[in-house]
């Protein structure tokens, strides 16, 4: 049995293209992997705090006592990291907002990137500590960006996930959503076909 963690990040709720793809992924995964456990964390509906000057102090060991706000942030960071490490497959819904991932998803990454816990520095360079995972990224875009200089999402996610130890990453794209109903429908259909292949793998 595998455990699947699904991270939603769209602010568009039911209108979200990435959200629809995520729901389709969950539906197909449950159908093909009946015994697996799926956990869904909606980072837009339940956002994590922005890492600011106060909160970053909670993520670094020190002698100074933590403020209540720092204590809460550290406890949440510990919870998110434990959740991440406890799952085998990580599904990340990453719609493109102004050429990048949603703020809500970036805030999550900022809370799980902790030296000595999800990565460490060695004489040979950084080493990821979140290993043995498989990641699937579902990315919807209004325009066409895949394999072009305007796609900042795929390279960024490859680097970040690899940095913490997740190197098995599959991307599913739904592009041209804003180009009209026909293009959007084809993009969704193609993305669902790609999801079917990922789920079956």
Swiss-Prot record:
It is an enzyme of class 1 (oxidoreductase). Pfam families: Flavodoxin_2 (PF02525). One of its GO terms (molecular function) is FMN binding. Keywords: Flavoprotein, FMN, NAD, Oxidoreductase. Its cofactor is FMN. The keyword NAD applies. Its EC number is 1.6.5.-, 1.7.1.17. It catalyses: 2 a quinone + NADH + H(+) = 2 a 1,4-benzosemiquinone + NAD(+); N,N-dimethyl-1,4-phenylenediamine + anthranilate + 2 NAD(+) = 2-(4-dimethylaminophenyl)diazenylbenzoate + 2 NADH + 2 H(+). FMN binds at residues 10, 16-18, 96-99, 140-145. Binds 1 FMN per subunit. Homodimer. Quinone reductase that provides resistance to thiol-specific stress caused by electrophilic quinones. Belongs to the azoreductase type 1 family. This is FMN-dependent NADH:quinone oxidoreductase. It comes from Salmonella typhimurium (strain LT2 / SGSC1412 / ATCC 700720). The lineage of its organism: Bacteria, Pseudomonadati, Pseudomonadota, Gammaproteobacteria, Enterobacterales.
């Amino acid at each position: 049995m595998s455990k699947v963690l699904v991270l939603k990040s769209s602010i568009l709720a039911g209108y979200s293209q990435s959200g629809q793809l995520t729901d389709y992924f969950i539906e197909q995964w449950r159908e093909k992997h009946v015994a697996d456990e799926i956990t869904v964390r909606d980072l837009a509906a339940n956002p994590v705090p922005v890492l600011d000057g106060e909160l970053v102090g909670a993520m670094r060991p020190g002698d100074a006592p933590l403020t209540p706000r720092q204590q809460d942030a550290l406890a949440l960071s510990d919870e998110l990291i434990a959740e991440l490490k406890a799952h085998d497959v990580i599904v990340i819904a990453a719609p493109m907002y102004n050429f990048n991932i949603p703020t809500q998803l970036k805030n999550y990454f900022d809370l799980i990137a902790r030296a000595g816990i999800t990565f460490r520095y060695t004489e040979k360079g950084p080493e990821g500590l979140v290993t043995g995972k498989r990641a699937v990224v579902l990315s919807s875009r209004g325009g066409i960006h895949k394999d072009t200089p305007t796609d900042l999402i795929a390279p960024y996610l490859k680097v970040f996930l690899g940095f913490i130890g997740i190197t098995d990453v599959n991307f599913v794209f739904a592009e041209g959503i804003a180009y009209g109903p026909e293009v959007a429908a084809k993009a969704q259909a193609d993305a669902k076909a790609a999801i079917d292949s990922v789920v079956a793998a």
